[in-house]
């Protein structure tokens, strides 16, 4: 394997930019409409009183940049494509737009939200329920790994919103347990992941079963050209709220790399870091499930308290581990990219990429765990000789400079 560039490192920033320019260039401008109004407060958005109560009770005081621009066009029933960094309140943007438009006297599914992982779907369900607390909203998450019969029972009893993963949602539509007749809003969250090869066909299949007149919202942290191309098939004159790629760096997150010439040296480097730093909570990313188990065993054998989660574990175990991590009873979490999307862990101050991601776009989702909503955070990347190309690709992709880890790293945490 030595000398081989990691999978995904053939990323070509120039080609990406050319493709984006082609899609978003002036000759394509008629595909999009623009919406220039910015609302500095939630009160100014014309939202229902009980929705505002839910927003303030959830802890929002002032809308984030994406919320200032994105909530109102969605509330007006416009198709929207919105791009914003992880941790900027993207989920609350579309949840508010959905909750504002529901007819609460009609207990039928009126909004369908799709997410790539069950963890993210459950996270969205929680936010939707919390923001809609004073509206009496009925939300249900349809995700794999749970009882089909229970899903059917809840859907039969009536809900306003279904959040789910494509496989289970399509299954419920096919069984006619989820009736599409009243669905008027269709949201794709983390569209870059959803529209990647794995889910593309299922999303098309679901879309075919929905009413022809439907509002579509596409939300994502990164917006690769393929995602934009596919939205053309679904959307009608969408309002585009895009952050240029240069701006999609996570403000407040200091990013460093450590040279670890060989793979075998990473473990020593990691243990050294944990012995010298006072870390409140941290997430360590590796690229395979097997490596999660291996690294967890190695860290525990050196008396470091760590927990781990990956896709081979049953859902119940993953839920318990995530609960412990959220509550702070476990402080170090080792995981794969499964967790990199949408898990809202507020106290994370440090993210370590033990392995660099295999695709530049996943870097943003990973380091977005730290510094959410402007909290400061540190991301440290372990870089072997074989990783140098990928590190360079990431820096080009986000237009950032990732510096070598300084000796005084303890002062940054």
UniProtKB/Swiss-Prot annotation:
Residues covered by the Helicase ATP-binding domain: 71-241
Motif extent (Q motif): 40-68
Reactions the enzyme catalyzes: ATP + H2O = ADP + phosphate + H(+)
Gene Ontology molecular-function annotations: ATP binding; ATP hydrolysis activity; RNA binding; RNA helicase activity; translation initiation factor activity
Motif mapping: DEAD box: 189-192
GO CC annotations, alphabetized: cytoplasmic stress granule
PROSITE patterns: DEAD_ATP_HELICASE, HELICASE_ATP_BIND_1, HELICASE_CTER, Q_MOTIF
Keyword flag Protein biosynthesis: yes
GO BP annotations, alphabetical order: cytoplasmic translational initiation
Enzyme class: hydrolase
Record-linked Pfam families: DEAD, Helicase_C
EC number: 3.6.4.13
Keyword annotations: ATP-binding, Helicase, Hydrolase, Initiation factor, Nucleotide-binding, Protein biosynthesis, RNA-binding
Annotated positions binding ATP: 84-91
UniProt keyword annotation of Isomerase present: no
Domain Helicase C-terminal: 252-413
Classification via PANTHER family: ATP-DEPENDENT RNA HELICASE DBP3
UniProt function note: ATP-dependent RNA helicase which is a subunit of the eIF4F complex involved in cap recognition and is required for mRNA binding to ribosome. In the current model of translation initiation, eIF4A unwinds RNA secondary structures in the 5'-UTR of mRNAs which is necessary to allow efficient binding of the small ribosomal subunit, and subsequent scanning for the initiator codon.
Homology family: Belongs to the DEAD box helicase family. eIF4A subfamily.
Subunit structure: eIF4F is a multi-subunit complex, the composition of which varies with external and internal environmental conditions. It is composed of at least EIF4A, EIF4E and EIF4G.
Official protein name in the record: Eukaryotic initiation factor 4A-10
Lineage: Eukaryota, Viridiplantae, Streptophyta, Embryophyta, Tracheophyta
């Amino acid at each position: 394997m030595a000398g081989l560039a990691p999978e995904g490192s053939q990323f070509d920033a120039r080609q990406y930019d050319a493709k984006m320019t082609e899609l978003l260039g002036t000759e394509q401008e008629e595909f999009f409409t623009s919406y220039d109004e910015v609302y500095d407060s939630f009160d100014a958005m014309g939202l229902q009183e009980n929705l505002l109560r839910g927003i303030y009770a959830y802890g929002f005081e002032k809308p984030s940049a994406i919320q200032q621009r994105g909530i109102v066009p969605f509330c007006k029933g416009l198709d929207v494509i919105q791009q914003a960094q992880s941790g900027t309140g993207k989920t609350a943007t579309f949840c508010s737009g959905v909750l504002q438009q529901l007819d609460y006297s009609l207990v039928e599914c009126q909004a369908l939200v799709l997410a790539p992982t069950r963890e993210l779907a459950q996270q969205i369900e929680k936010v939707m329920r919390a923001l809609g607390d004073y509206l009496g909203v009925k939300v249900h998450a349809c995700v794999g790994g749970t009882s089909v019969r229970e899903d059917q029972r809840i859907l039969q009893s009536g809900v306003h919103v279904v959040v789910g993963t494509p496989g289970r949602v399509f299954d419920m539509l096919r069984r006619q347990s989820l009736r599409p007749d009243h669905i008027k809003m269709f949201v794709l969250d983390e569209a870059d992941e959803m529209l990647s090869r794995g889910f593309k066909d299922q999303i098309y299949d679901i879309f075919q079963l929905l009413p022809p007149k439907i509002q579509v919202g596409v939300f994502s942290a990164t917006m690769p050209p393929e995602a934009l191309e596919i939205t053309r098939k679904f959307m009608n004159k969408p309002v585009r709220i895009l952050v240029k790629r240069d701006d999609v760096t996570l403000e407040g997150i200091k990013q460093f790399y450590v040279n670890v010439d060989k793979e075998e040296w990473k473990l020593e480097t990691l243990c050294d870091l944990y012995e010298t730093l006072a870390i409140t909570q941290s997430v360590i990313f590796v690229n395979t499930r097997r490596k999660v188990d291996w690294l967890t065993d190695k860290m525990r054998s050196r008396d470091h308290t760590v927990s781990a989660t990956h896709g081979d574990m049953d859902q119940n175990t993953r839920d318990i581990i995530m609960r412990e991590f959220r509550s702070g009873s476990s402080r170090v979490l080792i995981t794969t990219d499964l967790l990199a999307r949408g898990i809202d862990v507020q106290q994370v101050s440090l993210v370590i990429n033990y392995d660099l991601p295999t695709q530049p776009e996943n870097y943003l989702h990973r380091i977005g765990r730290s510094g959410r909503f402007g909290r400061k955070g540190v991301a440290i990347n372990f870089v072997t000789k074989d990783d140098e190309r990928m590190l360079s690709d990431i820096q080009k992709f986000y237009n950032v400079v990732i510096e070598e880890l300084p000796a005084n790293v303890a002062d940054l945490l």
